[in-house]
């Protein structure tokens, strides 16, 4: 799944950084994302500090395949509408597994998840071996980064210390991914 601008060895390096508790910036369908191991509270704290994000907002998890999301989801079968929309730019709120930490759910009973169609983001999840956190690479409330250069600009000097930046293209025509509640059908973000 590597692209011309994202060599396989860089994907492996960034996956190793995630496994070691680090934070990585990487391209997604619409913007650059910040990611970390969702099961590592120190890594999530670093990401939230870098982004200056309120932990009560919760975080999105992305994966390269549905099975990578299973540890974070409740036991109910996934609705057909969810499965039919993946891989793709569709994030769904689904019932969280009882052990899913509050730093991922924002203290709610649901978790936001997506199976990404972006080749670099999917390759990163594969190399990491599971789902990763995905939140836009910018300070909370600021415009999202759409290039590696913008990641450095938006996050400032801390970006060099806290985040490895994985090169690769984003779809410049794409809007941020839609977020919908799978149970109610409510559109959270169009």
Curated annotation (Swiss-Prot):
List its EC numbers: 2.7.7.87
The record's catalysed reaction(s) read: L-threonine + hydrogencarbonate + ATP = L-threonylcarbamoyladenylate + diphosphate + H2O
The record's listing under SUPFAM superfamilies reads: YrdC/RibB
Give one GO term, molecular function aspect: ATP binding
What is any one of the record's Gene Ontology cellular component terms?
cytoplasm
The record's annotation in InterPro entries points to: DHBP_synth_RibB-like_a/b_dom, Sua5-like_dom, TC-AMP_synthase, TC-AMP_synthase_SUA5
Q: Where in the cell is it found?
A: Cytoplasm
**Keywords assigned:** ATP-binding, Cytoplasm, Nucleotide-binding, Nucleotidyltransferase, Transferase, tRNA processing
Q: Where is the YrdC-like domain?
A: 8-190
GO BP: any one term = tRNA threonylcarbamoyladenosine modification
The main location is cytoplasm
The record's section on Pfam families has:
Sua5_yciO_yrdC
Q: Which domain of life is it from?
A: Bacteria
* Free-text function comment from the UniProt entry: Required for the formation of a threonylcarbamoyl group on adenosine at position 37 (t(6)A37) in tRNAs that read codons beginning with adenine. Catalyzes the conversion of L-threonine, HCO(3)(-)/CO(2) and ATP to give threonylcarbamoyl-AMP (TC-AMP) as the acyladenylate intermediate, with the release of diphosphate.
Q: Which PANTHER family match?
A: SUA5 (PTHR17490), THREONYLCARBAMOYL-AMP SYNTHASE (PTHR17490:SF18)
Recorded family membership: Belongs to the SUA5 family. TsaC subfamily.
Supply the name of the protein.
Answer: Threonylcarbamoyl-AMP synthase
Organism of origin is: Alkalilimnicola ehrlichii (strain ATCC BAA-1101 / DSM 17681 / MLHE-1)
Q: Which gene encodes it?
A: tsaC
């Amino acid at each position: 799944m590597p692209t011309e601008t994202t060599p396989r060895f860089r994907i492996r390096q960034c996956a190793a950084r995630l496994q070691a508790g680090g934070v990585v910036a990487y391209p997604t369908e619409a913007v650059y994302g910040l990611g970390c191991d969702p099961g590592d509270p120190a890594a999530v704290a670093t990401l939230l500090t870098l982004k200056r994000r309120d932990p009560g907002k919760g975080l999105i998890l992305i994966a390269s395949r549905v099975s990578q999301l299973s540890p974070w989801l409740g036991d109910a079968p996934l609705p057909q509408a969810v499965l039919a929309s993946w891989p793709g730019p569709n994030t769904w709120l689904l019932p969280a597994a009882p052990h899913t930490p509050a730093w991922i759910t924002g203290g709610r009973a649901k978790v936001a998840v997506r199976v990404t169609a972006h080749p670099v983001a999917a390759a990163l999840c594969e190399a990491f071996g599971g789902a990763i956190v995905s939140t836009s690479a910018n300070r909370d409330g600021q415009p999202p980064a759409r290039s590696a250069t913008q990641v450095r600009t938006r996050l400032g000097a801390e970006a060099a210390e806290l985040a490895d930046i994985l090169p690769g293209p984003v779809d410049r025509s794409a809007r941020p991914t839609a977020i919908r509640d799978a149970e109610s059908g409510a559109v959270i973000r169009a």
